[in-house]
């Protein structure tokens, strides 16, 4: 159980909030974007408190003025400590998911305050016409009413910062809809360390287990951002091209959606759709046979393997397009993937078509052994003929993640290499490098922005601009839209 401290100052018959909720026992930095001015701070080393100096703002009831990015601090089953201006300490136990809120250690003093506040002449002389939003005549001197009042104040705060109805988040009949599940839509303090890096770096995975369990029941309606963990309505996400509107993170996009985004409607002609993988080396696996994994991936994605290839028109320009799908066994490159890409390049060479390959892969497929590794050389060989002999134009688009054998072969052979923002691009993963070299890999060194600065990429292009950029590049290289008379 995590324990955190925050302070209240009881004075002048009113309640003044003096200290924002600290992130943990080891972190006492103030929370940003609070409506209270921050004049001076006092650090109490005896009790590990981060105390605040004089404030000019007073509040008539217990409103927790923490910023929305620290809602995560109110985790289920959490104990906080409160102390008043007389240094009297109280423990407050929160279990928002199970609707528990308890006050201990000197409760009577806290109750006296609420009773005296309710009975003060300031409140008794107040007329209803004052329309004070903080006035609540329901406050009484009992533990039950005190708890309910603070509960309602906390709940009102959550509702003002989270725009998701709680009945979407729980199917329990006993779940109180007045409580918002506190882990949804919160933001990490390190989402945006710089303008060029929005990748979450400081999040305990165990804190998010319940989030994932909840969203699994509603995955046909909602999807959760991998970066800020906000819940996003699937239909709205598709309109945003799978870009999280909360943090700008680029979520993975299926190969079918990518084709729909890039190719003009009604012009897509798929190739080699009936080509499927077998188990050429009889790969042995204790967990799941290779053929079973292929079958389950086919049922999950509706694809025969991890790449779709074909021809179509991009703003009227005929192109050959191959799109890898990470949802199919991590986009791994086996014999079928290599063969389909090879045939696509050969067809583009014969028909003098510009070529686009969209990469999203974890590398060579280990279940096929050396057969998967030889695909690197096979694809590179036909690309050499396409680029060097025929002088045709190949654009490589790297999405997150692009690693392993794909990076080491056709991923980095494009005449123009384009990456999506914040894409993870590497040959070997961070963990492999650190275990092999016994050296730490600098944070962000394998991100697209870092590779662009090092000269390994030509451009980083957002999804909404990609089709227009490709059109201009093709026209620059003398590939123009078909005339209306030429379109069949």
From Swiss-Prot:
Transmembrane segments: none annotated. It is found in: Plastid, Chloroplast stroma. Its cofactor is Zn(2+). Residues 221-488 form the CoA carboxyltransferase N-terminal domain. It is an enzyme of class 2 (transferase). Pathway: Lipid metabolism; malonyl-CoA biosynthesis; malonyl-CoA from acetyl-CoA: step 1/1. GO terms for cellular component: acetyl-CoA carboxylase complex; chloroplast stroma. GO terms for molecular function: acetyl-CoA carboxylase activity; ATP binding; carboxyl- or carbamoyltransferase activity; zinc ion binding. Keywords: ATP-binding, Chloroplast, Fatty acid biosynthesis, Fatty acid metabolism, Lipid biosynthesis, Lipid metabolism, Metal-binding, Nucleotide-binding, Plastid, Transferase, Zinc, Zinc-finger. A zinc finger (C4-type) spans 225-247. It catalyses: N(6)-carboxybiotinyl-L-lysyl-[protein] + acetyl-CoA = N(6)-biotinyl-L-lysyl-[protein] + malonyl-CoA. GO terms for biological process: fatty acid biosynthetic process; malonyl-CoA biosynthetic process. Component of the acetyl coenzyme A carboxylase (ACC) complex. Biotin carboxylase (BC) catalyzes the carboxylation of biotin on its carrier protein (BCCP) and then the CO(2) group is transferred by the transcarboxylase to acetyl-CoA to form malonyl-CoA. Belongs to the AccD/PCCB family. This is Acetyl-coenzyme A carboxylase carboxyl transferase subunit beta, chloroplastic. It comes from Aethionema grandiflorum (Persian stone-cress).
